[in-house]
UniProtKB/Swiss-Prot annotation:
Location relative to the cell: Plastid, Chloroplast thylakoid membrane
Molecular function GO terms recorded: 4 iron, 4 sulfur cluster binding; iron ion binding; NADH dehydrogenase (ubiquinone) activity; quinone binding
Family membership: Belongs to the complex I 20 kDa subunit family.
Topology versus the membrane: Peripheral membrane protein
Species for this entry: Vitis vinifera
The protein's assembly and partners: NDH is composed of at least 16 different subunits, 5 of which are encoded in the nucleus.
Lineage per the UniProt record: Eukaryota, Viridiplantae, Streptophyta, Embryophyta, Tracheophyta
GO annotation, cellular component aspect: chloroplast thylakoid membrane; respiratory chain complex I
NCBIfam families hit by this protein: nuoB_fam, PRK06411.1
Gene this chain is encoded by: ndhK
Cofactor note: Binds 1 [4Fe-4S] cluster.
Protein name: NAD(P)H-quinone oxidoreductase subunit K, chloroplastic
Main location: plastid
């Protein structure tokens, strides 16, 4: 088990008296009492479930999974986050008491993963919704990597000052669920106009009249008994 060092903690005082600060005492009390809210949406969460077994035994870090955000101070996001799930994730984070922390686990959570190129319904990184403390890349990350991320989070907690963290979150809020969508052309008709096919959607938009004109010109398929 990795020990956490407190640089401001003085253990040389005689008569077994330890002098410290209120911030260090508060941080020390939270190191071994992280209660995570498990927000798993896809395959990355299966790797985190391995930590519950006796092989890795994440109870030695004081982790107690909670099902209510009001009783959790750590949310671990694992898997793809869609646009419809984004407001729910933000609401869960806002219901958690301060101080609260976030671990982003897996490529889909950090950048959108393989869905980040052509999917209109995937959030390109959970840090666009909530502030992230530790990024854990991988597809999926191994249980050993999850333990390392928790260890790094504990080291971060041991050195932070509560007032500075609250001030930083208030000045750098990144909650947003607003995305702009555009009407696109159908790609399953089997009949395309070459001008529309090679027209870059980033430089110009297809007028609605042109879109419905070419859509209605395609004949419906015929079925033969």
């Amino acid at each position: 088990m990795n020990s956490i060092e407190f640089p401001l903690l003085d253990r040389t005082t005689q008569n077994s008296v330890i002098s410290t600060t209120s911030n260090d005492l508060s941080n020390w009390s939270r190191l071994s009492s992280l209660w995570p809210l498990l927000y798993g949406t896809s395959c990355c969460f299966i790797e985190f479930a391995s930590l519950i077994g006796s092989r890795f035994d994440f109870d030695r870090y004081g982790l107690v999974p909670r099902s209510s955000p009001r009783q959790a101070d750590l949310i671990l996001t694992a898997g793809t986050v869609t646009m419809k799930m984004a407001p729910s994730l933000v609401r869960l984070y806002e219901q958690m008491p301060e101080p609260k922390y976030v671990i982003a686990m897996g490529a889909c959570t950090i950048t959108g993963g393989m869905f980040s190129t052509d999917s209109y319904s995937t959030v390109r990184g959970v840090d666009k919704l909530i502030p992230v403390d530790v990024y854990l890349p991988g597809c999926p990350p191994k249980p050993e990597a999850v333990i390392d991320a928790i260890t790094k989070l504990r080291k971060k907690i041991s050195r932070e000052i509560y007032e500075d963290r609250i001030r930083s979150q208030q000045e750098n809020r990144c909650f947003t669920t607003n995305h702009k969508f555009h009407v696109g052309r159908s790609t399953h008709t089997g009949n395309y106009d070459q001008r529309l096919l090679y027209q870059s959607p980033s430089t110009s938009e297809i007028p609605l009249e042109t879109f419905f004109k070419y859509k209605s010109s395609v004949s419906s398929p015929e079925f033969v008994n």
